[in-house]
C-alpha cells in the first residue's frame, strides 16, 4: 500500500509546525480523504474517521472557541486518536491551548497554514490523490512534446530511447525512459512519472546511460506529466495495412482510463521524431476542433457530388 509521511505533506504545502516531535512527523498517511470535524465537536462520533487528516477551518475553529475550556479539551481528546496522522488549522488561526494539551497527550502533530480552508483542502486532496494512487509500470518513453504527454512504446530495440533523445535535442522534455509509472489522477486523467532510480536518465545502446539533465540542462527534463497520447512504434511490414487517414480509432487502457493510441511504422529514411511531433500537434488540433481527416472527407464528398452533377 502506498503511503505519505506527515513531513512530506508539510514540505509540499509549506505548513507551519505548532507542535510535532520528530517521530510524529514520520507518521504515515494511508488515505487521501480529509475530515473537517463538525458533528464530532458536538459529541457525535458515530462514523468518525480518525485515520484521516483532520482539517479545521473558520467554522470549526469558531465553534471550538465558543465552547467552555473543559468541554473543548474533552472533545479534542476524543478526536485525537493514535491513528490520526495530523491536525491542520487553516487561515493562520490561533491554536487554542486545549488543542496543544490534547495533542501532547495523544502524540499528534498540530500544523497550521495561512491558506484559505477550501484552497488548502483542494491542494491537500490533489497531492494525496496523486501520491497514494496505485501505480502501473509500463515499458516505454514518456515525453513532454509541446506541453502534451506522449507515451512512446514499441518492441525492444525499435529505437524508443533514441527517438526520445532526438526529441530532447529538438527542444522537448524527457519525463521517463524505459519504465514509466502511470496512475489515474481521476476518472479521465492519466499521469506518468519515472522510477526514482531512473529519473532524468536515458539508455542508448552502444553509448550507455546518459544523464539528460547534466548534458542538456534543467529545461530538457520534467518530473511528471499527464499522459494524453500513446504512440506505438513497429517495424514496417509490406503485408500489413497501416492507417493512412487517421480514422482508425485505437486506445490504450491503463488503470481503467483509456487514451488514444496511434501506430507508426519504422523503416529506413523515416524521421520518427518529426512524425511523432506531427502526431502530437495533430492530436492537439483535433482536441481544439480541427480535424484534418474530417476536412478531407468533406472535400472528397463535395468533389464526388460535383462530378456526379457534371456527368448527369
From Swiss-Prot:
Domain of life: Bacteria
Keyword tags: ATP-binding, Carbohydrate metabolism, Kinase, Magnesium, Metal-binding, Multifunctional enzyme, Nucleotide-binding, Serine/threonine-protein kinase, Transferase
Active site residues per record: 139, 160, 178, 244
InterPro entries registered for this protein in UniProt: HPr(Ser)_kin/Pase, Hpr_kin/Pase_C, Hpr_kin/Pase_Hpr_N, P-loop_NTPase, Ser_kin/Pase_Hpr-like_N_sf
GO molecular function, one term: magnesium ion binding
Catalysed reaction, written as an equation: [HPr protein]-L-serine + ATP = [HPr protein]-O-phospho-L-serine + ADP + H(+); [HPr protein]-O-phospho-L-serine + phosphate + H(+) = [HPr protein]-L-serine + diphosphate
Region of interest (Important for the catalytic mechanism of both phosphorylation and dephosphorylation), residue spans: 202-211
Record-level GO BP terms: regulation of carbohydrate metabolic process
Annotated region (Important for the catalytic mechanism of dephosphorylation), positions in chain: 265-270
Cofactor: Mg(2+)
SUPFAM superfamilies in the cross-refs: HprK N-terminal domain-like (SSF75138), PEP carboxykinase-like (SSF53795)
EC number: 2.7.11.-, 2.7.4.-
Pfam families for this protein: Hpr_kinase_C, Hpr_kinase_N
Residues the entry annotates as binding ATP: 154-161
Binding residues for Mg(2+): 161, 203
Function according to Swiss-Prot or TrEMBL: Catalyzes the ATP- as well as the pyrophosphate-dependent phosphorylation of a specific serine residue in HPr, a phosphocarrier protein of the phosphoenolpyruvate-dependent sugar phosphotransferase system (PTS). HprK/P also catalyzes the pyrophosphate-producing, inorganic phosphate-dependent dephosphorylation (phosphorolysis) of seryl-phosphorylated HPr (P-Ser-HPr).
Oligomer and partners: Homohexamer.
Domain remarks in the Swiss-Prot or TrEMBL record: The Walker A ATP-binding motif also binds Pi and PPi.
Protein family: Belongs to the HPrK/P family.
Record NCBIfam families: hpr-ser
Further comment found in the protein's record: Both phosphorylation and phosphorolysis are carried out by the same active site and suggest a common mechanism for both reactions.
Name the record gives this protein: HPr kinase/phosphorylase
Species this chain originates from: Streptococcus pneumoniae serotype 4 (strain ATCC BAA-334 / TIGR4)
Record lineage: Bacteria, Bacillati, Bacillota, Bacilli, Lactobacillales
Amino acid at each position: 500500500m502506498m503511503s505519505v509521511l506527515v513531513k512530506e505533506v508539510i514540505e509540499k504545502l509549506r505548513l507551519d509546525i505548532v507542535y510535532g516531535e520528530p517521530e510524529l512527523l514520520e507518521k504515515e498517511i494511508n488515505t487521501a480523504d480529509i475530515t473537517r470535524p463538525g458533528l464530532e465537536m458536538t459529541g457525535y462520533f458515530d462514523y468518525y474517521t480518525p485515520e484521516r487528516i483532520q482539517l479545521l477551518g473558520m467554522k470549526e475553529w469558531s465553534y471550538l472557541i465558543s465552547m467552555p475550556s473543559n468541554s473543548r479539551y474533552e472533545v479534542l481528546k476524543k478526536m485525537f486518536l493514535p491513528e490520526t496522522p495530523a491536525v491542520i488549522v487553516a487561515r493562520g488561526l490561533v491554536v487554542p491551548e486545549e488543542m496543544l494539551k490534547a495533542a501532547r497527550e495523544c502524540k499528534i502533530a498540530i500544523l497550521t497554514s495561512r491558506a484559505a480552508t477550501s484552497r488548502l483542502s483542494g491542494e491537500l486532496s490533489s497531492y494525496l490523490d496523486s501520491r497514494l494512487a496505485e501505480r502501473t509500470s509500463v515499458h516505454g518513453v514518456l515525453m513532454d512534446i509541446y506541453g502534451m504527454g506522449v507515451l512512446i512504446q514499441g518492441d525492444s530495440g525499435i529505437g524508443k530511447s533514441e527517438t526520445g533523445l532526438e526529441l530532447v535535442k529538438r527542444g522537448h522534455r524527457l519525463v521517463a525512459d524505459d519504465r514509466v509509472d502511470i496512475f489515474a489522477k481521476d476518472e479521465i486523467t492519466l499521469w506518468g512519472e519515472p522510477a526514482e532510480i531512473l529519473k532524468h536518465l536515458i539508455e542508448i545502446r552502444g553509448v550507455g546511460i546518459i544523464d539528460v539533465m547534466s548534458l542538456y540542462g534543467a529545461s530538457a527534463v520534467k518530473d511528471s506529466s499527464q499522459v494524453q497520447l500513446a504512440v506505438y512504434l513497429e517495424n514496417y511490414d509490406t503485408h500489413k495495412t497501416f492507417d493512412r487517414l487517421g480514422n482508425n480509432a485505437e486506445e490504450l487502457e491503463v488503470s481503467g482510463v483509456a487514451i488514444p493510441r496511434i501506430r507508426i511504422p519504422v523503416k529506413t529514411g523515416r524521421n520518427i521524431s518529426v512524425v511523432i511531433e506531427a502526431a502530437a500537434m495533430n492530436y492537439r488540433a483535433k482536441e481544439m476542433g480541427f480535424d484534418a481527416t474530417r476536412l478531407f472527407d468533406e472535400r472528397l464528398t463535395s468533389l464526388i457530388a460535383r462530378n456526379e452533377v457534371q456527368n448527369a
